[in-house]
């Protein structure tokens, strides 16, 4: 099927490189990669033409997701992340209510208070992110055959003893 590109030999080198980047991402987060097993559960290609856009969504069935830009022109749409929780919102509604800006309370929209974050990506870039992050692509762009390879990854404990919040090793699962 189209959701298992990682099983296609033509993509084996690319996916080996992506795996290295995923390991770096995990280490960057301070996670001991010796204690977990990492599974790529799905991987697929998306071709975008014209004004097509990907609506905001999450990959709730996995832990880590990625998008690798195999083909991308400067005019093609970028990936966008949507802030659902407004972690820096110290006053309720200050970042979402238009009157706060109109009334001069909020002086500017910036990286720390924006509802959406547009990540400028170029061809051969990869974006790795938590699967729970709400994301999509920009609208009103003229895509010229943008091709991205995306995938989902699951992290499982090698030894789940005394761990409440990790999935136990797959070899201990029982199919019902």
Protein language model features and the residues they cover:
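Non-heme Fe(II)/2-oxoglutarate
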Residues: 1-32, 46, 53, 78, 142-176, ...
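Catalytic core of non-heme Fe(II) oxygenases with the double-stranded beta-helix
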Residues: 48-126, 145, 159-165
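Histidine-centered metal-chelating micro-motifs
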Residues: 53, 132-136
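A short coil-to-beta-strand element that immediately follows conserved catalytic motifs
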Residues: 31-43
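A structural signal for short, well-ordered beta-strand segments
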Residues: 43-45, 66-68, 149-153
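Short beta-strand segments enriched in hydrophobic/aromatic residues
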Residues: 70, 133, 153-155
């Amino acid at each position: 099927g189209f959701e298992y590109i990682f099983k296609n030999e033509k993509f084996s080198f690319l996916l080996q490189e992506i795996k290295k980047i995923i390991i770096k991402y995990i280490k960057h987060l301070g996670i001991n990669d010796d204690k977990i097993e990492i599974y790529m559960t799905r991987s697929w290609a998306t071709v975008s033409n014209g004004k097509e856009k990907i609506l905001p969504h999450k990959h709730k069935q996995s832990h880590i997701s990625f998008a690798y830009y195999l083909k991308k022109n400067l005019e093609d749409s970028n990936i966008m992340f949507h802030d659902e929780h407004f972690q820096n919102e110290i006053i309720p509604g200050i970042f979402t209510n238009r009157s706060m800006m109109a009334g001069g309370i909020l002086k500017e929209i910036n990286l720390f208070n924006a509802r959406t974050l547009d990540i400028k990506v170029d061809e051969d870039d990869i974006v790795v992110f938590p699967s729970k992050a709400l994301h999509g692509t920009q609208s009103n762009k003229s895509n010229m055959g943008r091709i991205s390879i995306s995938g989902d990854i699951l992290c499982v404990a090698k030894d789940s003893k005394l761990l409440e919040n990790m999935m136990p090793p797959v070899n201990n699962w029982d199919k019902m």
